[in-house]
């Protein structure tokens, strides 16, 4: 398949080399990662078709994963949408007020005034009446093998529900990107991949989002394929016997205003994903977004 080459940046700091690749869409990324005519590693786990790899990656082959990228992951889309709808039914968790009460305002709320409440006047929510800010969201799709597809689906549904809620209420407009990073055990070489999924102001395409955020093949086929194409600076040899260790990305380099870490580093225990329905997990994810919009990390730490 023909594709446009991604933008490639090479940087070096303290004898550690980073290769960073920027993609304008999921199809471009998957096509580049799957190009077997290009120079790549001798290890090709992304293309492996054993029964063990099929179970681990969620697809029998790279071609099967590519088909989901091109035509959509129907089962995943349906499950993602149902999870998002389940969250949306919990209106109190996602809906910001369209007006705010105070001691002064445009008009009174009569029942409150009769009851003697001093905060009985209301105005339009300033956030909604002003110009909505634009955010650049980056979601790290790194995940260790202990997370299965159902866990990733719940995680992705919660993130997309926050994005959908904030945009539909006019609180902000959000550009959505996924990213992934890996490094050698000694940190001498790193590779980073950034894929834009949605421009600010565009509607959420659940076909694209379901595969990109919740399918194991996004990491274990497509992103592994991306890693296999990083051949400069003896990357394969320096990674050791595998694909290195998952890593986080630098917010300043990304130009991110919102950054969701890999699910292993999100601060939410895996037991919650195993035991609880998605609407019970959502408040924790919403809390993470509140932290980020206050200028802190997803986990609530100071930047």
Model-derived features: where do they sit?
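Acidic, low-complexity intrinsically disordered regions
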Residues: 1-157, 161-303
């Amino acid at each position: 398949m023909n594709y446009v080459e991604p933008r490639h940046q090479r940087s070096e700091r303290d004898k550690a080399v980073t290769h960073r690749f920027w993609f304008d869409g999921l199809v471009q990324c998957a096509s580049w990662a799957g190009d077997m005519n290009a120079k790549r590693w001798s290890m090709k786990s992304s293309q492996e078709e054993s029964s063990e790899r099929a179970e681990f990656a969620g697809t029998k082959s790279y071609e099967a994963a590519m088909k989901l990228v091109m035509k959509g992951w129907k089962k995943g889309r349906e499950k993602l949408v149902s999870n998002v709808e389940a969250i949306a039914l919990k209106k109190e968790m996602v809906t910001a007020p369209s007006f705010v009460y105070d001691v002064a305002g445009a008009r009174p709320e009569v029942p409150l005034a009769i009851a003697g409440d001093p905060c009985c006047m209301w105005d339009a929510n300033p956030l909604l009446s002003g110009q909505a800010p634009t955010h650049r969201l980056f979601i790290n799709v790194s995940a260790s093998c202990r997370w299965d597809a159902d866990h990733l689906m719940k995680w992705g549904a919660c993130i997309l529900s926050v994005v959908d809620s904030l945009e539909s209420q006019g609180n902000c407009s959000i550009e959505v990107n996924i990213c992934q990073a890996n490094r050698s055990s000694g940190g001498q070489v790193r590779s980073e991949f950034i894929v834009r999924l949605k421009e600010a102001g565009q509607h959420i395409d659940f076909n694209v989002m379901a595969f990109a955020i919740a399918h194991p093949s996004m990491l274990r086929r497509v992103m592994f394929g991306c890693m296999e194409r990083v051949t400069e600076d003896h990357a394969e040899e320096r990674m050791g016997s595998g694909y290195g260790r998952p890593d986080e990305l630098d917010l300043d380099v990304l130009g991110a205003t919102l950054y969701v870490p890999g699910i292993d580093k999100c601060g939410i225990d895996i037991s919650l994903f195993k035991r609880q329905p998605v609407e019970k997990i959502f408040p924790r994810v919403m809390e993470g977004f509140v932290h980020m919009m206050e200028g802190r990390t997803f986990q609530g730490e100071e930047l």
